[in-house]
A protein has these predicted regions:
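Flexible, glycine/charged-enriched surface loops at secondary-structure junctions
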Residues: 31-33, 159-168, 191-199, 288-296, ...
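Glycine-rich phosphate/nucleotide-binding loop
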Residues: 39-43, 207-307
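N-terminal beta-loop-helix "entrance" segment that forms/cooperates
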Residues: 30-52, 208
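Buried hydrophobic positions in well-ordered alpha/beta secondary-structure cores of metabolic enzymes
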Residues: 9-12, 61, 114, 152, ...
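N-terminal glycine-rich phosphate/adenylate-binding segment common to multiple enzyme folds
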Residues: 42-135, 223
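Glycine-rich phosphate/diphosphate-binding loop of Rossmann-like nucleotide-binding domains
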Residues: 4-26, 130-202, 214
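Buried hydrophobic packing segments
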Residues: 19, 23, 184, 208, ...
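Short glycine-rich or small-residue beta-strand-to-loop segments that form or flank ligand, phosphate
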Residues: 2-8, 63-67, 164-170, 278-284
Length: 332
């Protein structure tokens, strides 16, 4: 089968090469079609997303991407946001769990974040009223709320999860977040076997750093989902172990949550675990469940052993050496 590979910026090319090598070692038979996107692509060709990229993704429906840089406060819109809106990948799925061998304050985190991916403040509707006043529109619609809430409950049912928690700020934003919360409760009533509750976003942040094991599935509007995704990654060792899937009706785009890390780009220092875990999510959705499980097991075993690991978790191995170690475990 064909799938699109977008290395992205910074460390993207190095970790994308890890994916290629691991894919070959697993004999997946995937034919990778590589395209450029991001700041480096713009500098080289004048195009943020290389010509042919969108057509290729639409044709095959599957893509795996590395990190892309986004300028702060000015410049072009996030490539991630553009891709999500272009392909209506309405659900961003981010599993978070403790990894043996990674030093953290918690040893029992196992939760999933389901983030609405297409609207909210990320719709990009903002403008200057004058030189001193900027305005941004928080767009929340019932269809999008219903779709993401139903996705969260369906995911919980399919994966044996027991509770879904809605994340909101409806005490202040009574119309927008109020609509999200009301829709959540309506959908929850259709899944009586799954517990449903809700939590205000600021209170949730406190509870996550106090007792994260009390949460199972978190469903959130776009902005809150983005914020708590990084928070939860910090609970389990950082963004080096944070994969995600952007899921639409006909397209799925998998990626690591972390950034492009330009400070270590080209130095063979990047931890490829997150993008390899995202690749495992992709394999699982392709029906290659045994290969996905084998890859996840290899990553977990390598990290738990702690001998050949990257600097972000206390090791001295480079990207290439760590990847070779994973491939060796796949051959066992």
């Amino acid at each position: 089968m064909k799938a699109v590979l977008i290395p992205g910026d910074g460390i993207g090319r190095e970790i994308a090469e890890s994916v290629r090598e691991v894919s070959a070692a697993l004999n997946t038979g995937i034919e990778w079609q590589e395209f450029a996107a991001g700041a480096e692509s713009a500098a080289e060709s004048g195009e943020l997303i290389a010509p042919g990229t969108l057509d290729a993704i639409e044709a095959c429906g599957w893509a795996l991407k590395g990190p892309t840089a986004t300028p702060i406060g000015k410049g072009f819109r996030s490539i991630n946001v553009q891709l999500r809106q272009r392909f209506s990948t309405y659900a961003n799925l981010r599993p978070v769990h403790t990894l043996p061998g990674v030093p953290t304050r918690f040893d029992n985190v196992d939760l999933v974040i389901v983030r609405e991916n297409t609207e909210d403040l990320y719709k990009g509707i903002e403008y200057m009223l004058n030189d001193e006043i900027a305005n941004g529109v928080k767009l929340i619609t019932r269809p999008a709320c219903e779709k993401i809430c139903r996705f969260a409950f369906d995911y919980a049912r399919k994966n044996g999860r027991k509770k879904v928690t809605a994340v909101h700020k409806a005490n202040i934003m009574k119309l927008t977040d109020g609509l999200f919360l009301r829709t959540f409760r309506e959908v929850a009533a259709e899944y009586p076997e799954i517990a449903a509750d809700d939590c205000i976003i600021d209170a949730l942040c406190m509870k996550l750093v106090q007792k994260p094991e009390q949460f199972d599935v978190l469903v959130a509007p776009n902005l809150y989902g983005d914020i708590i995704s990084d928070l939860c990654a910090g609970l389990v060792g950082g963004l080096g172990f944070a994969p995600s899937a952007n899921i639409g009706d006909s397209t799925r785009i998998y990626e690591a949550v972390h950034g492009s890390a330009p400070d270590i780009a080209g130095q063979d220092k990047a931890n490829p675990s997150a993008i390899l875990m995202a690749f495992a999510m992709m394999l699982n959705d392709l029906g290659e469940t045994d290969k996905a499980a084998k890859l996840n097991a290899a990553i977990l075993a390598q990290v738990e052993e702690g001998k050949v690991v990257t600097a972000d978790i206390g090791g001295t191995a480079g990207t290439k050496e760590f990847t070779r170690a994973i491939i060796s475990r796949l051959a066992e």
